[in-house]
Regions:
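A short, aliphatic-rich alpha-helical micro-motif
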Residues: 4, 56, 76, 174-176, ...
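Glycine/Thr-rich phosphate-binding loops of Rossmann-like dinucleotide-binding domains
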Residues: 72, 125, 190-191
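Short, structured coil segments at secondary-structure junctions
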Residues: 5, 28, 78-80, 135, ...
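Rossmann-like adenosine-cofactor binding region
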Residues: 158-223
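Single conserved hydrophobic/aromatic residue that forms the stacking wall/gate
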Residues: 1-6, 11, 221-232
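Glycine-rich phosphate/diphosphate-binding loop of Rossmann-like nucleotide-binding domains
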Residues: 15-23, 111-161, 166-173, 177, ...
Length: 232
């Protein structure tokens, strides 16, 4: 059979990421080597290209969860084995693939589905926008002013001829007719000192029963951004 040895490099330490990927490696007949935040000083103690070359010699695949998206790009360019993007400050592609599968499981299709993201225009939103530039989507990002997603990524997604992409600050109209409501934490890693201030700014963007009255369905990533709404 195919030998599968995976190297996990998690600079942003998260239990769910480690468990899900290590379980996946195991079920595919391989095993994982975990390198935590203190094991590699990527871009500091160790050059990214050197890390990529060394790990490529010992492993069949590299899964990295990093702070800096530039490090992910350099890692993939320097490695001689496949590199899986487990998360960066710019995007989170594996999460979105899992979300699409969840939507499909509950709705039997991803066609003609309106997805509304409510909250901070962060790496999750960038991933949805990247997806909208590849496959047809009806996607709305509902966020406070000043918390919009990456402008270049928005432009790229809007320039497609097959996706409907909207960025809005109007809560009432933004969620109207939504089939899927998606939310995330208001203060991501590295922003915890802003948590109290963000809680005030995002208070009107909390997913709750009042908001859900204008939608067709509910799908939530539960956090402080969600209150009393039942999840699918």
């Amino acid at each position: 059979g195919v030998r599968l040895v995976g190297s996990e490099m998690c600079i942003r330490d998260r239990a769910r990421t480690r468990v899900s990927f290590e379980t996946g490696f195991f079920k595919l007949g391989g095993h994982a080597l975990y390198l935590g935040p203190n094991d590699i000083g990527i871009g500091k103690r160790e050059a990214v290209k050197d890390i990529a070359r060394v790990l490529s010699r010992y492993n069949d695949v590299i899964m990295a969860r990093l702070f800096d998206h530039k490090h992910m790009i350099e890692l993939s360019q320097s490695a001689s084995v496949p590199v899986i993007n487990g998360l960066t400050d710019y995007n989170h592609p594996c999460q979105i693939m899992a979300d699409l599968l969840t939507i499909y499981e509950h709705m039997d299709s991803i066609e003609n589905i309106k997805v509304v993201y409510v909250g901070d225009g962060n790496n999750i939103v960038n991933s949805w926008l990247n997806l909208a530039s590849i496959v047809p989507l009806d996607f709305t990002c509902l966020c406070p002013e000043g918390f919009e997603p990456d402008s270049a990524t928005v432009k790229m997604a809007k320039n497609t001829s097959f996706s409907n992409v909207e960025i809005t600050h109007d809560v009432e109209s933004g969620v109207l007719g939504a089939d899927v409501i998606y939310t995330d934490v208001w203060a991501s890693m590295g922003q915890k000192e802003e948590a109290d201030e963000r809680a005030k700014i995002f208070s009107n963007f909390q997913v709750n029963s009042k908001m859900m009255n204008s939608t067709n369905n509910c799908l939530l990533y539960t956090s402080d951004a969600a209150d009393d709404t039942p999840c699918v």
